[in-house]
Design a protein with these regions (language model features):
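Short, non-transmembrane alpha-helical segments in secretory-pathway proteins
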Residues: 1-43
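A short, surface-exposed interaction/processing loop segment used at functional sites
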Residues: 69-88
Length: 88
């Protein structure tokens, strides 16, 4: 299946995968917060990752102040295998 078509048809599955990976982060590095799906991108050329790969971005929101406190990025390959992740 075409990667773009698969993402469009199954975007909730991709976001849920990113949330699952975020929840596996060591608790001392993970904040209890509201998680909001932000974007899904296909990277076709990247300096560090084998491409094409998928970047899934989640927004992290402080529950008390309703304020953005960071972002979580998950990178997966076409088979949905883990490539990398960043918490900023």
């Amino acid at each position: 299946m075409d990667l773009q078509k698969e993402i469009i048809e199954n975007k909730e599955e991709f976001y849920n995968l990113a949330i699952e990976y975020y929840n596996n982060i060591d608790k001392k590095h993970r904040k209890e917060c509201l998680i909001t799906p932000k974007s899904i991108s296909i990277l076709i050329d990247h300096q560090f990752f084998t491409t094409p790969c998928v970047e899934i971005k989640l927004e992290l929101i402080d529950q008390d102040y309703q304020k953005n406190i960071g972002h979580y990025f998950l990178y997966i390959d076409e088979k949905k295998d883990f490539v990398d992740e960043f918490l900023v």
